[in-house]
Amino acid sequence: MTLKAGLEIHQQLNSGKLFCNCGLSENGKDVQFKRKLHATSSELGDVDIAAKTEQIKLFTYYNKSCNCLVYTDEEPPRGPNADAVKIALQFAQLVNAKIVEEIHFMRKVVVDGSNTSGFQRTGLIATGGIIEYDGKILELDQLCLEEDSCRHGEEDHEYLLDRLGVPLLEITTKPQLDDSKDVQKAAKAIGRLLRACNVKRGLGTIRQDVNVSVNNGQRVELKGFQDLASMPKVVENEVKRQSRLYQMKEGKIGQPINVDNCFKKKREFSLALKIENWNGILGNKDSPEGHVRMGRELADYAKRAGLKGIMHSDELPAYGIDNEETENIKLSLGCNDNDAFILIFGKEKITKNAMEIIVERINTKGVPKEVRKVTPKNLTRYLRPMPGASRMYPETDIAPFKIANLKVRKPKTLDEREKDLPLNDEESKQLVNNELDKQFNILNKKFDLPKLLSRILLHTLPQLKNEGETISDSDLEKVLILFQKGVIVKEGIPKALVQSSRNEEIQVNSDNVEDELEDFIVSLVSDKREFIKEKGMGAVGALMGPVMSKFRGKMDGGDINKVLMEKVKEIL
């Protein structure tokens, strides 16, 4: 089977929210309100299939931590945020994409509770462009600026508004990847290029989706990758799953029938469906990856309709249904030994809706066009139907945004920033990866101490932070000034930083510290004369310990070692 894959990257931008004046970390008052969302039709009057599926559940959505009226959908949106637009344009420049003259925002229907308005706003920024990875080129399809969704709360119906409205840059590539490892490499290259711009960092700030198809079949969108390391394995397993779906027998189905009279005890409304020649397919566990187990697949479809799951002939009798009841169902459906059946229970309306969805899925040949979520075992499970063009319609509350009014400078890439640093490759890479190169350049321009500054930023400050100390930029500059004046030595910088941060007096070197050092070493080597004669110059290492314990931070370690070696030689 031939793989064809493309990427969709969603990166949070480090600006204010997209259509209000709220900051990204602002939570506001703890306000609770409820909404029941309904799917709206597109310009052509069609309702998107994905929106229809969400609407079947008839949830009442609950949001809290409300931070402004725009994102409670109580007042019109403002904006868009100019800083967010600039960041998006910077990335467009980096990939040589063709930037649009005006941004026209659209509404994308979303009724799963993740947006209070029932839609997500998105605007096209640029088209085309390329990403280079591992000596290869991947073409981009388009770049869009959109608003992020709510976070899930503790309950399924509960959502938190702190993330709603955070600007997202959506990067969509063309389906040109034909190797699972290339999918990972391309995603990594895009992520690295994004970090040249002012984007958010940390867990959950970037999300990667992968579109996968085999043999030019239907596109399946994979969501929820935990990390880039799992990407090749997930894609490989998805290719196997789709390949097996193409090889699977076609299931011929009968009419769903009510089988309430097949049970000894009264149960909820029940429907059963016969599937010819599917015996063993619903509960198949033969493949090592667990694909394709159609019973689980159909159960996931039923859950989206509001049921808790399904039962099927490959696992019955079980779950309170005995052998006699199982045989009654088979008899009612007219099943033979090669046939299978599906059984569902629930409220009549929900059960009928669920059965319609199950029937539609069974009748779909090969691979259905759908969205699937990635599991911790690097497999995928059905999430929802693939949205279509019917979910889009124009945003009437936001005027077109003219890009010509913005002056945007193309940022340097991470590689370019590394080359600009007067350090070795490893130190330069660490500073850039930790977003410390800007601070380094500012300090180095003032003090011209590249090696020392690299050591302080990469090692000293993180170590002090781990010890619970908070060192400000002013503390660091104050100590560096004292170092350049020669009143503290390199080894004394960590202690001086702590003293400055605690508003304590910084202990500087005394004028006679060299005399004190010489007196101390003379006394020490006199006491250890026999030890020195026995060990020779090898005694220096052992004697450095007590000397450094007294003079660490007062004098340079190299100078201390030099004096000690001279005194040891005199003994020898």
Region spans (language model):
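N-terminal, positively charged regions that mediate nucleic acid binding
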Residues: 1-103, 109-110, 188, 203, ...
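Short, well-ordered strand-loop elements centered on a beta-strand within folded domains, enriched
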Residues: 3, 17-21, 136-141, 219-222
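Charged, compositionally biased, marginally structured helical/coil segments
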Residues: 4-7, 13, 30, 76, ...
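A short, sequence-level motif marking secondary-structure junctions
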Residues: 25-26, 143-147, 223-229
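Short acidic, glycine/tyrosine-flanked loop/strand segments centered on an H-E-D-like triad
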Residues: 57-68, 160-170, 212-214
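Alpha-helix capping at helix-to-loop junctions
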Residues: 94-101, 149, 196, 244
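Conserved, charge-rich beta-strand/loop surface module that forms ligand/interface-binding patches
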Residues: 103-105, 114-183, 377-385, 402, ...
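A short beta-strand-loop-alpha-helix capping motif that often carries His-Thr
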Residues: 106-113, 205-213
